[in-house]
Amino acid sequence: RHIFEPTVSYNYRPNPTVLRTKLQPFDAIDAIDKQNVIHYNFENKFQTKERAADGSLSTREIARIIPFFDTDLHTGRLRNAGMRMELRPYGWLGIEGDSMLDAESRHVDTTNLDFYLEKGPVRLAIGQRYVRDESSQLTAEIRWKLTQDLDVKFYERYEFETNDSKEFEVML
């Protein structure tokens, strides 16, 4: 079955009391500016019925796709557009992604795409991260669930622009 769920939200932020040009930039919060935006989400869920091992029927979500866009009420223009998606064609295979388009330049600003396989206690994942004019990264992860409360995880994030490892993580 297909479930369609549109939502609309409003975000208003008045002018900051201190101009951002007078702040020493520390992180993204220092670049916050006035905002008057309506955000539109159009969530689509696709579900199927599957027979469980005991013979009963259960519902499984096979896809969740959410196109969205923002309208700036100050200028009356489209500000951002994008899409988030989660695909589970099989219980053991998943694909997740998101992308953001700059409506003014009509360029893709960011894109993330991950493929993963899960079989029993093991999860293998590979992904791509892209930020326009800044970064193109590959991610890889291996996770093994040893017990209910104990996992082993290896994670690597590699940057193609500079040909080096940006992050390597081992977790227990």
Question: What is each model feature region?
Answer:
Residues 1-171:
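Outer-membrane beta-barrel translocator/pore domains, especially the C-terminal barrels
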